[in-house]
């Protein structure tokens, strides 16, 4: 288990940089509506959904009901269901740790688990577990720092939630550069663009994910040859 820590930490450095900043932004926004570091800690520990927590700040500010918060968070993060489908067998082999892996499967962690290569002599399950735990700890740390520093120094939070979009863009570019097969990426861009144009920004995510899954299944034979 300990041997896998160093390569896992190295692999998660980009997420460390992004999560500290994005988590910090979340913490500042949470402090801005009157919640302190304890709230940030337990929110990031138990919810752990970047976009969902950003939405949570808006809903808390509007004094939305718990039912509204739960439904909106589910709709916003239901894309994670599709992530989990590709790791059913992998997580099952990890024993009791699979429950934490399911919980901690964020966009960035999923991206790393799909692309990272386990060094020789390192257990792949241990490395995946460390990646998930490290990413989670970065997010918690960023949020707590945001609420603490946000309470000391004044911040203008206008546009600060764009940090999440920035991180997604960086991860997409890194994955594009690390592989020769760009068909899945082009599928994703096309499906998202068409869905956005037809359904608008409030309703495009789930249909786009469904379209991407259908296209990937339909072209799995060709994609397997391209990757090989």
Q: How does the language model describe each region?
A:
Residues 125-207:
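Membrane-embedded alpha-helical modules
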Residues 7-102, 116, 138:
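Pore-lining transmembrane helices
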Residues 53-58, 82-87, 173-178, 196-205, ...:
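Juxtamembrane membrane-interface segments at transmembrane alpha-helix termini
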Residues 24-28, 45, 55, 112, ...:
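Alpha-helical transmembrane segments of multipass membrane proteins
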Residues 48-51, 75-82, 167-173, 192-194, ...:
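Alpha-helical transmembrane segments and their membrane-interface exit regions
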Residues 1-7:
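Short, Lys/Arg-rich, polar N-terminal cytosolic tail immediately upstream
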Residues 70-161:
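Helix-loop-helix junctions within the multi-pass membrane cores of secondary transporters/permeases
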Residues 27-31, 88, 118, 146-150, ...:
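Membrane-water interface at transmembrane helix exits
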């Amino acid at each position: 288990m300990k041997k896998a820590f160093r390569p896992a930490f190295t692999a998660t450095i980009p997420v460390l940089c992004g999560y500290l900043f994005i988590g910090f932004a979340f913490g500042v926004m949470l402090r801005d509506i009157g919640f302190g570091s304890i709230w940030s800690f337990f929110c990031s520990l138990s919810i752990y959904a970047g976009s969902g927590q950003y939405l949570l700040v808006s809903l808390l500010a509007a004094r939305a009901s718990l039912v509204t918060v739960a439904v909106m968070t589910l709709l916003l993060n239901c894309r994670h269901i599709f992530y989990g489908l590709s790791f059913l067998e992998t997580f099952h082999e990890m024993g009791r740790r699979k429950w934490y892996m399911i919980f901690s499967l964020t966009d960035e962690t999923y991206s790393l688990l799909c692309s990272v290569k386990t060094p020789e002599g390192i257990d792949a399950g241990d490395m995946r577990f460390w990646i998930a735990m490290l990413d989670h700890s970065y997010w918690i740390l960023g949020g707590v720092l945001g609420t603490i520093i946000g309470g000391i120094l004044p911040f203008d939070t206008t546009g600060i939630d764009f940090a999440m979009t920035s991180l997604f863009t960086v991860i997409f570019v890194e994955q594009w550069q690390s592989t020769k097969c760009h068909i899945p990426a082009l599928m994703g861009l096309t499906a998202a663009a068409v869905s956005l144009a037809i359904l608008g920004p409030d309703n495009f995510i789930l249909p786009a994910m469904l379209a991407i899954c259908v296209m990937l299944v339909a072209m799995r034979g060709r994609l397997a040859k391209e990757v090989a």
